[in-house]
Amino acid sequence: MKKLLRLFFPLSLRVRFLLATAAVVLVLSLAYGMVALIGYSVSFDKTTFRLLRGESNLFYTLAQWENNKLHVELPENIDKQSPTMTLIYDENGQLLWAQRDVPWLMKMIQPDWLKSNGFHEIEADVNDTSLLLSGDHSIQQQLQEVREDDDDAEMTHSVAVNVYPATSRMPKLTIVVVDTIPVELKSSYMVWSWFIYVLSANLLLVIPLLWVAAWWSLRPIEALAKEVRELEEHNRELLNPATTRELTSLVRNLNRLLKSERERYDKYRTTLTDLTHSLKTPLAVLQSTLRSLRSEKMSVSDAEPVMLEQISRISQQIGYYLHRASMRGGTLLSRELHPVAPLLDNLTSALNKVYQRKGVNISLDISPEISFVGEQNDFVEVMGNVLDNACKYCLEFVEISARQTDEHLYIVVEDDGPGIPLSKREVIFDRGQRVDTLRPGQGVGLAVAREITEQYEGKIVAGESMLGGARMEVIFGRQHSAPKDE
């Protein structure tokens, strides 16, 4: 059962369109049909009344008043089997003349009807109607079919009442004309039955037209789906921007996404290439050290720090490239709130272990209220690179201070090292540029730090420290949306 449902649900756009339009057509057809039928019924009643009134006028002209009695002489050309029956009453409601003697029908005429012109209906048993129309064989066959379906069925007869005022030759008369053929057997009544057939035929004709309309209307979507399949099969690079107005925005955004993903792929590929290139130097140093050990030119104790330093460098480079490869331009920055002091404590603790032999003395002057708004890894990456450089080039002391405004976070790192020449203070942030080429490094740490701070609309400013070395001021922007502690 579930497999069968999956074949039909969720419904395709074409099926949804067909069902919706078919429902609209059905409702409108029913509404228009009902209005037409009701209008036809009203028109039919008026037409029937006019015909019966004409019959009444005919009998009024044939009527003669002699010796206080009413005489009606029917011409020979009048069909005695006429589908109407005429009754003539005086002003007191007394029956003066009847075309035929049908007692049950005469009893159905209400006295109130005789007072004014009007159109009425009477209900008769199907057997009584059959006796009334005993001379019409075709009607008898139809009544027999009705009787077979429902022996207690009732037939409806139309009645027209016309009042004629008194004249010099004729007293006031009321002529009642009864249509002996039931409304149910008239062809006009069959319109209700034919309506179902017409509606069905209408739907059978409309649905194919709706299918064609759906096919033509949804062609742009089918073309888009085809292009997406070609993308999956790597047979095209972008979607065709020449599409309908409604799909233009979707196609444009999808093309942007495709370009972004392609750029990301290119970035991964470039990152792998850069990583491979950056590992050549530490690997070459490791190979050279191993050869020296094998030839006993270097002792294990002398080789160990060199190898550990290179292994550490390899680990740092791998971590750096993995992190950078996962970053995407235009990505929304996290708005998480992180206290600065604990993050810097963790970093300085790790750096003290790394530079334990050097004996670096790191001091922190950070207020507990100062916080960073953003991704924690970004903060650690930036400050890790800046502090690593400070520890690497300092003689002994590294000082860290911070301050915060509504819009920015300022962190200052100072050391007592050789400092940075004025001419190099901008170059050091370029990828691959280094001030001291004698020390190990790839010249990417500060470049990475600058790229991350620029994502926060910030920057890193290199200057001269009061300690005699370098002063690096790291500025993080986008701090105005920081949530406030309650």
UniProtKB/Swiss-Prot annotation:
Keywords: ATP-binding, Cell inner membrane, Cell membrane, Hydrolase, Kinase, Magnesium, Membrane, Metal-binding, Nucleotide-binding, Phosphoprotein, Protein phosphatase, Transferase, Transmembrane, Transmembrane helix, Two-component regulatory system, Virulence. This is Virulence sensor protein PhoQ. It is found in: Cell inner membrane. It catalyses: ATP + protein L-histidine = ADP + protein N-phospho-L-histidine. It comes from Shigella flexneri. The gene is phoQ. GO terms for molecular function: ATP binding; metal ion binding; phosphoprotein phosphatase activity; phosphorelay sensor kinase activity. InterPro entries: HAMP_dom (IPR003660), HATPase_C_sf (IPR036890), His_kinase_dom (IPR005467), HisK_dim/P_sf (IPR036097), PhoQ_Sensor (IPR015014), PhoQ_Sensor_sf (IPR038429), Sig_transdc_His_kin-like_C (IPR004358), TCS_sensor_his_kinase (IPR050428). A divalent metal cation binds at residues 151-152. Mg(2+) binds at residues 385, 442. Residues 215-266 form the HAMP domain. Member of the two-component regulatory system PhoP/PhoQ involved in virulence and adaptation to low Mg(2+) environments. In low periplasmic Mg(2+), PhoQ functions as a membrane-associated protein kinase that undergoes autophosphorylation and subsequently transfers the phosphate to PhoP, which results in the expression of PhoP-activated genes (PAG) and repression of PhoP-repressed genes (PRG). In high periplasmic Mg(2+), acts as a protein phosphatase that dephosphorylates phospho-PhoP, which results in the repression of PAG and may lead to expression of some PRG.
